[in-house]
Protein backbone atom coordinates (compact mmCIF):
# COMPACT_ATOMS: atom_id res chain seq x y z
CA UNK A 1 0.00 0.00 0.00
CA UNK A 2 1.32 3.45 -0.94
CA UNK A 3 1.24 6.57 1.23
CA UNK A 4 -0.38 9.96 0.74
CA UNK A 5 0.79 13.57 0.86
CA UNK A 6 -1.02 15.85 3.28
CA UNK A 7 -0.64 19.14 5.08
CA UNK A 8 -0.14 19.60 8.82
CA UNK A 9 -3.02 21.69 10.16
CA UNK A 10 -2.02 21.75 13.83
CA UNK A 11 -2.60 19.98 17.13
CA UNK A 12 -5.68 19.58 19.30
CA UNK A 13 -7.10 16.95 21.60
CA UNK A 14 -10.08 14.64 21.58
CA UNK A 15 -11.72 12.75 24.41
CA UNK A 16 -12.61 9.08 24.67
CA UNK A 17 -15.94 7.94 26.11
CA UNK A 18 -14.12 7.40 29.41
CA UNK A 19 -13.02 11.05 29.42
CA UNK A 20 -9.37 10.37 28.62
CA UNK A 21 -7.70 13.22 26.71
CA UNK A 22 -5.73 12.17 23.60
CA UNK A 23 -3.35 14.71 22.00
CA UNK A 24 -3.70 14.51 18.21
CA UNK A 25 -2.19 16.15 15.15
CA UNK A 26 -4.67 17.03 12.42
CA UNK A 27 -3.42 16.30 8.88
CA UNK A 28 -5.46 17.51 5.93
CA UNK A 29 -5.15 15.06 3.03
CA UNK A 30 -6.78 16.33 -0.14
CA UNK A 31 -7.12 13.94 -3.07
CA UNK A 32 -3.71 12.84 -4.37
CA UNK A 33 -3.83 12.85 -8.19
CA UNK A 34 -1.70 10.38 -10.15
CA UNK A 35 0.59 12.25 -12.59
CA UNK A 36 2.84 9.38 -13.72
CA UNK A 37 3.03 5.61 -13.40
CA UNK A 38 6.57 4.23 -13.52
CA UNK A 39 7.10 0.63 -14.58
CA UNK A 40 9.92 -1.88 -14.38
CA UNK A 41 10.18 -2.00 -18.18
CA UNK A 42 10.39 1.75 -18.80
CA UNK A 43 11.99 3.12 -15.64
CA UNK A 44 13.75 0.19 -13.99
CA UNK A 45 11.46 0.24 -10.96
CA UNK A 46 7.76 0.40 -10.12
CA UNK A 47 6.37 3.59 -8.63
CA UNK A 48 3.51 6.05 -8.79
CA UNK A 49 3.99 9.83 -8.88
CA UNK A 50 1.31 12.04 -7.35
CA UNK A 51 0.46 15.70 -6.83
CA UNK A 52 -1.98 17.42 -4.50
CA UNK A 53 -3.42 20.86 -3.88
CA UNK A 54 -3.12 23.61 -6.48
CA UNK A 55 -0.64 26.17 -7.76
CA UNK A 56 -1.15 29.50 -9.56
CA UNK A 57 -0.75 29.10 -13.31
CA UNK A 58 1.90 31.85 -13.34
CA UNK A 59 4.01 29.77 -10.93
CA UNK A 60 3.99 26.59 -13.05
CA UNK A 61 6.99 26.16 -15.37
CA UNK A 62 6.44 25.04 -18.96
CA UNK A 63 7.96 21.56 -18.38
CA UNK A 64 5.74 21.13 -15.31
CA UNK A 65 2.66 22.35 -17.20
CA UNK A 66 3.29 19.84 -19.99
CA UNK A 67 3.73 17.05 -17.44
CA UNK A 68 0.40 17.87 -15.76
CA UNK A 69 -1.44 18.25 -19.09
CA UNK A 70 -0.16 14.85 -20.23
CA UNK A 71 -1.57 13.30 -17.07
CA UNK A 72 -4.81 15.25 -17.45
CA UNK A 73 -4.71 16.70 -13.94
CA UNK A 74 -4.70 20.18 -12.40
CA UNK A 75 -1.24 21.53 -11.51
CA UNK A 76 -0.47 20.78 -7.87
CA UNK A 77 1.92 22.31 -5.36
CA UNK A 78 4.57 19.64 -5.87
CA UNK A 79 5.38 16.12 -7.06
CA UNK A 80 5.94 13.11 -4.82
CA UNK A 81 6.71 9.48 -5.61
CA UNK A 82 5.82 6.22 -3.87
CA UNK A 83 7.24 2.79 -4.70
CA UNK A 84 4.59 0.24 -5.63
CA UNK A 85 4.40 -3.54 -5.37
CA UNK A 86 1.75 -4.92 -7.68
CA UNK A 87 -0.81 -2.13 -7.20
CA UNK A 88 -2.46 -0.82 -10.36
CA UNK A 89 -2.86 2.92 -10.93
CA UNK A 90 -4.00 5.01 -13.89
CA UNK A 91 -3.13 8.57 -14.92
CA UNK A 92 -5.48 11.10 -13.37
CA UNK A 93 -6.71 8.67 -10.71
CA UNK A 94 -7.55 10.27 -7.36
CA UNK A 95 -6.47 8.60 -4.11
CA UNK A 96 -8.25 9.76 -0.96
CA UNK A 97 -7.69 9.64 2.80
CA UNK A 98 -10.14 6.73 3.20
CA UNK A 99 -7.36 4.30 2.19
CA UNK A 100 -6.28 4.64 5.85
CA UNK A 101 -9.68 3.52 7.15
CA UNK A 102 -8.37 0.09 8.18
CA UNK A 103 -4.82 1.17 9.08
CA UNK A 104 -3.94 1.14 12.79
CA UNK A 105 -0.55 2.93 12.73
CA UNK A 106 1.29 5.21 10.31
CA UNK A 107 4.75 6.69 9.74
CA UNK A 108 4.79 10.45 9.12
CA UNK A 109 7.67 12.20 7.31
CA UNK A 110 8.15 15.96 7.22
CA UNK A 111 10.73 18.74 7.35
CA UNK A 112 11.48 19.76 10.94
CA UNK A 113 11.30 23.39 12.03
CA UNK A 114 14.52 25.27 11.30
CA UNK A 115 16.24 26.67 14.41
CA UNK A 116 19.23 28.31 12.74
CA UNK A 117 22.77 28.10 14.17
CA UNK A 118 22.62 26.64 17.68
CA UNK A 119 25.15 25.62 20.31
CA UNK A 120 25.91 22.17 21.66
CA UNK A 121 23.61 22.48 24.67
CA UNK A 122 20.46 23.06 22.60
CA UNK A 123 21.52 21.02 19.55
CA UNK A 124 22.88 17.90 21.27
CA UNK A 125 21.63 18.22 24.87
CA UNK A 126 25.16 18.64 26.25
CA UNK A 127 25.32 19.40 29.98
CA UNK A 128 26.47 22.89 30.92
CA UNK A 129 29.67 23.46 32.85
CA UNK A 130 29.91 24.96 36.35
CA UNK A 131 28.15 28.26 36.85
CA UNK A 132 30.86 29.37 39.34
CA UNK A 133 33.68 27.49 41.10
CA UNK A 134 36.40 29.09 39.01
CA UNK A 135 34.52 29.08 35.70
CA UNK A 136 33.87 32.56 34.34
CA UNK A 137 33.88 32.12 30.54
CA UNK A 138 32.94 28.57 29.56
CA UNK A 139 29.47 27.91 30.93
CA UNK A 140 27.93 26.65 27.68
CA UNK A 141 30.96 25.58 25.62
CA UNK A 142 31.50 21.94 24.64
CA UNK A 143 34.71 21.24 26.54
CA UNK A 144 37.35 19.02 24.94
CA UNK A 145 36.67 18.11 21.30
CA UNK A 146 39.66 15.85 20.68
CA UNK A 147 42.68 13.98 22.09
CA UNK A 148 46.37 14.87 21.68
CA UNK A 149 49.05 14.97 18.99
CA UNK A 150 47.71 11.53 18.11
CA UNK A 151 45.37 11.72 16.21
CA UNK A 152 45.99 15.47 16.05
CA UNK A 153 42.61 16.24 14.54
CA UNK A 154 38.91 16.36 15.37
CA UNK A 155 37.05 13.22 14.32
CA UNK A 156 34.38 13.53 11.63
CA UNK A 157 30.88 13.58 13.05
CA UNK A 158 31.92 15.18 16.34
CA UNK A 159 28.89 16.77 17.94
CA UNK A 160 29.46 20.52 17.86
CA UNK A 161 27.57 23.77 17.34
CA UNK A 162 25.93 24.17 13.94
CA UNK A 163 22.70 24.35 11.99
CA UNK A 164 19.75 22.77 13.78
CA UNK A 165 16.49 21.63 12.20
CA UNK A 166 15.14 22.08 8.66
CA UNK A 167 15.90 18.43 7.85
CA UNK A 168 13.82 15.44 6.81
CA UNK A 169 12.47 13.63 9.87
CA UNK A 170 10.26 10.54 10.15
CA UNK A 171 8.18 9.70 13.22
CA UNK A 172 7.22 6.04 13.26
CA UNK A 173 4.19 4.07 14.44
CA UNK A 174 1.80 6.91 15.28
CA UNK A 175 -1.65 5.60 16.15
CA UNK A 176 -4.48 6.54 13.79
CA UNK A 177 -7.19 8.00 16.02
CA UNK A 178 -9.74 9.04 13.40
CA UNK A 179 -10.23 9.17 9.63
CA UNK A 180 -12.70 11.87 8.53
CA UNK A 181 -13.17 11.21 4.80
CA UNK A 182 -15.88 13.86 4.48
CA UNK A 183 -13.61 16.67 5.71
CA UNK A 184 -10.45 15.04 4.27
CA UNK A 185 -8.78 14.83 7.68
CA UNK A 186 -6.55 12.27 9.36
CA UNK A 187 -6.03 12.48 13.12
CA UNK A 188 -2.93 10.78 14.54
CA UNK A 189 -1.88 10.50 18.16
CA UNK A 190 1.13 12.64 19.08
CA UNK A 191 3.28 15.17 17.28
CA UNK A 192 4.58 15.13 13.70
CA UNK A 193 7.60 17.02 12.29
CA UNK A 194 7.29 20.43 10.71
CA UNK A 195 5.53 23.75 11.05
CA UNK A 196 1.83 24.40 10.58
CA UNK A 197 0.82 24.17 6.89
CA UNK A 198 3.96 22.21 5.96
CA UNK A 199 3.70 19.16 3.71
CA UNK A 200 3.94 15.71 5.29
CA UNK A 201 4.05 12.21 3.83
CA UNK A 202 1.87 9.61 5.56
CA UNK A 203 2.54 5.90 5.03
CA UNK A 204 1.34 2.72 6.74
CA UNK A 205 3.78 1.93 9.56
CA UNK A 206 6.63 -0.41 8.65
CA UNK A 207 6.85 -1.67 12.25
CA UNK A 208 3.12 -2.05 12.89
Swiss-Prot record:
SUPFAM superfamilies assigned: Translation proteins (SSF50447)
Q: Which UniProt keywords apply?
A: Methylation, Ribonucleoprotein, Ribosomal protein, RNA-binding, rRNA-binding
The answer on whether this UniProt entry bears the keyword rRNA-binding reads yes
The residues the entry assigns to the signal sequence are none
Stored InterPro entries = Ribosomal_uL3, Ribosomal_uL3_bac/org-type, Ribosomal_uL3_CS, Transl_B-barrel_sf
Q: Which residues are annotated with the PTM N5-methylglutamine?
A: 149
Any single Gene Ontology cellular-component annotation: cytosolic large ribosomal subunit
Per the record, the similarity remark reads: Belongs to the universal ribosomal protein uL3 family.
Assembly behavior: Part of the 50S ribosomal subunit. Forms a cluster with proteins L14 and L19.
Give the protein name, as stated in the record: Large ribosomal subunit protein uL3
Please name the gene that encodes this protein.
Answer: rplC
Amino acid sequence: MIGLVGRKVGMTRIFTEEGVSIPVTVIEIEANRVTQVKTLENDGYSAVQVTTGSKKASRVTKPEAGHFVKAGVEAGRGLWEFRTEGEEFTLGQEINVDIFADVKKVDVTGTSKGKGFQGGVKRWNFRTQDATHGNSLSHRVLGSIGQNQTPGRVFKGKKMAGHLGAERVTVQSLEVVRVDAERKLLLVKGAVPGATNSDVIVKPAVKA
